[in-house]
Amino acid sequence: MRRREFLTGLGATAAVLKTGLAQTTAGAPDAVQAELDRQVATGLVAGCVCTTVGGRTWFGGRMRFDPPVPMRPDALFDLASAAKTFTAGLCALLYAEGRLDPDAPFTDYLPEHVLAQERHGITVRDLATHTGGFDNAKPYIVADPVEFNRRLYAKRPVRPRGVAYDYACSNMIYLGRIVEHITGLDLESAAIKMLWRPLGMEETYWHNIPGNARAVEAMQNGHPPIGFKGDEQARAYPAAMGNGAAFSCAADMLRFVDDLRTRRTFPKAYYDLLSTPCFEKGAVRRSFGWDMGAAHRPAGWSARTMTHGGFTGVTIGVDPGSGRAGVVLTNRLGERLAGYEGHRRLLALMSR
């Protein structure tokens, strides 16, 4: 069933979605479940799984449409850009090990780039904060990997570094390539060895998962086949890339963000790099790979809050200041910004 067909029949099925598919681990309705049910019933999302510290999980709606499959708490979602935080985390681990200098020119680690032959000043940190001057143009999206790389490394900034925040997927692709150059591992292998395994994240994947019964049907990015990455850049290249498009479940993502709250697994330098604001201008406030701006902060969370979203309908967040952390995973149907606002409402309600 396509998105339009689903929305057409939504009014007739809203009552079923509210009473038959929406559940909590406690089995009782509450404010979080009521908000989740509302988002499903109004067509903002097809389904949702959300969880917070303490392990309680809420879920409801549908994970697939034809035939309809109810959402399950261990469903695997395409994280889209929320997986950029894995790339940032790997860089932070390399920094903590003394193998990566965030304030070095990024071309020190990526000599293939055209700027390596020029005086440019763009640092690794600039890439992580999206302030190096690159825009979000994607001239490198072609089917041939060799040509993909040639165009990727030929991309030039459109403005001087540090002038403005401009979210660009290529920034994180470059950081992913830097991780691979330093470690000698492909990005997924590096994530498994350095980040996911130490955190106990056993159900997170940076490759397609066709045939997996837990894979959610994503309704964005051209409605890709179930279990396949939706991002056009990820589809164009045969290996994991730093701009995101990994698959994971709510339990694994809570392990990831909750560790940023408790700071128990990795060296102090890892947490400090990721949680310290390093670009502030106007309403923009960025740390290394994370958004710390007030506009994306759930109600009641402190100024230390770190969040990241994903186009498919995902938000992950942690507030080391108040001890909050949470994950909202949806297969979004409605408008993107309305989806993010819905995520913030759920995170605020879960943390009361």
Descriptions of predicted regions:
Residues 28-77:
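Short, conserved catalytic-motif segment at the N-terminal edge
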Residues 42-47, 67-126, 159-170, 241-244, ...:
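Short active-site loop at a secondary-structure junction
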Residues 307-315:
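Low-complexity, glycine/alanine/valine/leucine- and proline-rich hydrophobic stretches
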Residues 46, 57, 62, 116-306:
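Short, surface-exposed loop or secondary-structure junction motifs
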Residues 295-299, 335-352:
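Short, gly/Ser/Thr-rich active-site loops of penicillin-recognizing serine hydrolases
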Residues 5-23:
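N-terminal export signals
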Residues 315-316, 323-332:
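Short, well-ordered beta-strand elements
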